[in-house]
Amino acid sequence: MTITRTLLHLLERHLSLSALTAGEAGPLVVFCHGFPGLAFSWRHQLTALAAAGYRAVAFDMKGYGQSDRPLDLEAYQARVVSDDLAAVLDALGAERAVFVGHDFGAKAAFCMALHHPERVAGVVSLAVPYGVQFAGARDDGAAKGPADATPQGDAKPPADAIKRTEDGVVLSARK
């Protein structure tokens, strides 16, 4: 599978994000890297998912790699970043996606689910601590962890949404 680098121009947000894409069609999976990662960190996952029939996109988060680096610190607040992710979907012509986040990229994915639940088909988080780093994810500052960053505030998915693969990987999806 081929990976293509492109620049996503989020015109209404006055922001450009460097992205790697693989796969032309299929359900969309968006990867959000952590510190000190880049879109390149997801190259193996992009090709594997594209080969499995998914459209996979990873981008350099705002302030990283070849993406824009706004000087205004408010541009990096959780709500602003979740709005950026919604604009990424718009730029890709997609209504919904599964978001995969590593480290602080998981916070972005959780906040996307909180603020734009209709655009999120699922969230996968990797290597992210539970706790105070999520404080302030909600506008009222009440979010304290991943459970608070889900639309229903319930960290426990329904039993029919969980599947364990033969190699022990646990998959979860929201309908």
Predicted regions and their residues:
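Short gly/ser/thr-rich secondary-structure transition/capping motifs
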Residues: 10-13, 37
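Conserved HGGG/HGGXW glycine-rich cap/lid loop of the alpha/beta-hydrolase fold
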Residues: 20-68, 88
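Flexible "cap/lid" subdomain of the alpha/beta-hydrolase fold that forms the substrate-access gate
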Residues: 1-7, 16-17, 42, 57, ...
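A short loop-to-beta-strand scaffold at the N-terminal edge of the catalytic core in hydrolase folds
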Residues: 12-21
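Residue-level marker of motif borders
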Residues: 13, 28-29, 98
